[in-house]
Amino acid sequence: MTDSGGGVTLSGGEPLLHPSYTLELLAELGRRGFHRAVDTTLFAAPEVVRSVAAACELFLVDLKAMDSAVHQQYTGVPNEQILQNLRMIASFSPSAPEGHPYRIRIPLIAEVNASEANIAATASFLCSLDRKPDQVDLLPYHDIGKGKHERLGTVYNPAGLSLSAPSKDDQARCLRQLADAGLTVTIGG
């Protein structure tokens, strides 16, 4: 894999919910020469985040909403632990074992987190970190997983929440807001 630049990304559910397995898998992948990325919400104990950070080369961090009450409403958990862990990984020196690049991934949902206020709060928070993210990826909402849930006989949106992608104009506004704050931003990752 070192010739191709390829690697392995551990993702959801949430790999940090299973720290022993995640660390064991990351160690084995490292022994085999794979680049290791972890796609996470960072909703975990700080010691778990620190251990995983030392065992991978890249964090892809989902950041859903800056207002903790909104975050709780749409995800079931508040965001304080997530923001604390994000501050921690941003504080790691690039020369430290834990100090790898990290990217922020924002699933943009029109009615939830694509407002000017939330994006401004996100930009302010990210710019306040010791080390800014290497990139911010805006990921417009989609319902691709809906068919999978139907095939499995599970409910796609159990809370019946109104979910839709922001308009192209709103996506462009979100990108501009973050870029104007000095962040490197893409739409679609």
Stretches with model-predicted labels:
Residues R151-G160:
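Short glycine/proline- and charge-enriched loop/turn segments
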Residues F34, T154, L183-T184:
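Short aromatic/hydrophobic-glycine micro-motifs
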Residues A114, N118, S162-P166, D170:
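Short amphipathic alpha-helical interaction segments
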Residues M1-E150:
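Conserved AdoMet/S-adenosylmethionine-binding subsite of the radical SAM
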Residues A165-G189:
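A cross-taxonomic marker for long C-terminal extensions/tails that follow the last structured domain
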